[in-house]
Amino acid sequence: VQLSVAEDARYRPFTTEALASELADATKGETGRGAIVSADGRRLAASLDAGKVIATPYQIEDPGAAAAALAETLGDAAGSAGEIREKLAGANEGATGGYSVVAEGVEPERAREVSKLGLTGISVTPDEVRTYPNGPLAGQLIGYLGTDQAYGGVEARYDEILKGGQDVELTLDTAVQRELEVALTEAAEEYDGKSALGLVMRVEDGAIVALAHTPGYDNNQFAEAPEEVKRNRILTDPYEPGSTFKPFTMAAALEEGVVSEQDTFMVADSMPVADVVIQDSEAHAPEVLTPGGILQHSRNVGTIQVAQSLGGERLVENIKRFGFGEETGVDLWGENAGIVPPFEEWSGSSIGNIPIGQGLTVTPLQLASGFASLANGGLQVTPHVTSNADTREPGRRVISEKTSSIVRGMLQTVVDEGTGHFARIPGYTVAGKTGTAQKVDPETGFYGDEYVTSFIGFAPAHDPKYLALIAVDEPQKALWGEVVAAPAFQNVMGFTLGYYNVPPDREGTKNDDPPPDPVLAPDAKKEDSIR
């Protein structure tokens, strides 16, 4: 029901002098939308006082004169005098109250000026405008409030709470968020990547302290932003993780007791698996490697040999135990569960691709959640972005503390002596894994010439506090995750550890010359498509 104040001199003080008080109180009571606030107290989304100009067309004596006066007073807020004149000519189609909205979200001062015009048939009511004070910072995570509904992110997920006037506090910290966004932008630009994404997570409980994509967008200009940049790809877009998945294969074999950290494997640089020849990323002579050495050098062949010791059925069981193939339960909407092919649907070559992160899909959020379990002693975490969902209750056990400790040590060696050398941080032990994953060409169903390069890791290695994931999509100037993504990880994780005052656990860091860049082996011949 639309009510308007009768055009009577007795009511004029209400529409003029009292208007300022009405507008000031409009968003402060229980009916005003709550703010979205960062963990460090910054308002990332807030509702500001405003006014709404409403016309009752049948009461307007001279629409042309009224339109001219409103256009001069409102400026760009309502359009030209001609556009306003059309609004004054008749009620909105289907509006039972016989009124027309001339302008919404009008600045309080302009709203007061409209009221002072004293135009018959024109009234001003309290309104509010949603604004995003930090511009593009964490745009996809925050989401957007439109005229009729909320779109994506926290705005949509916590719409009912916000509509009730309650603030929503995030686990996100704007300082870490800015550092992450800068690092992603620089990595994508330096290596001519199509896009980049990343996150920083507390390994103890899955609290997300930063989450970003590039290119990003500003929710203050939501309508102008391309649709493809508005998606929170960290939870909506699954991909084949490549070598960042190998630690889960190793953890499964260790947990099931089919290998020990002292076992050795004779690892060649290629091996046939059914109708596919699997090759390592670099040509090398046959070598004797422990499971840790296999991870250190990111050997495809060695990882498959470990997986064959375990068997496909038990491998799938362990993969599912880490949460792959199902939603993580993050407190955001739109999450994709990814795909883990059931063992019954495996082909003969599946044991040659799934252990090395091909032939299955995961979201970046699932990968981070799984790595948190590797890091924190083997407990599942539920990723979350708001303190409303914060929980200190331990999750179910995924792997034993012993297996977690062994894998942490292996991943530290990856950084200290292996492919992750560019992720070293002075003063800290760091554990992590590089990834260079081939992308499937959607037109052919076969692997194409584009890659996702990534690095995921945590620190300090033996008592992890935070993990970070960096992924760059389709870099053109370099191929390897150790070159493209690891330096960005180093910057972000180094900042995070210092910002949260995590005590150093190492004097200096290893400063040996890094291993030479790998020599790309000939492409493996792939006879069947990956579905």
Task: Name the predicted role of every residue range.
Residues P514-P515:
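A short, charged, Gly/Pro-tolerant segment at domain boundaries
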Residues V1-F222, E313-G323, A471-D473, A478-K510, ...:
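Periplasmic/cell-envelope proteins involved in peptidoglycan metabolism and beta-lactam response
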Residues G198, R202-S243, F248-E474, G481, ...:
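Beta-lactam-recognizing serine transpeptidase/beta-lactamase-like catalytic domain environment
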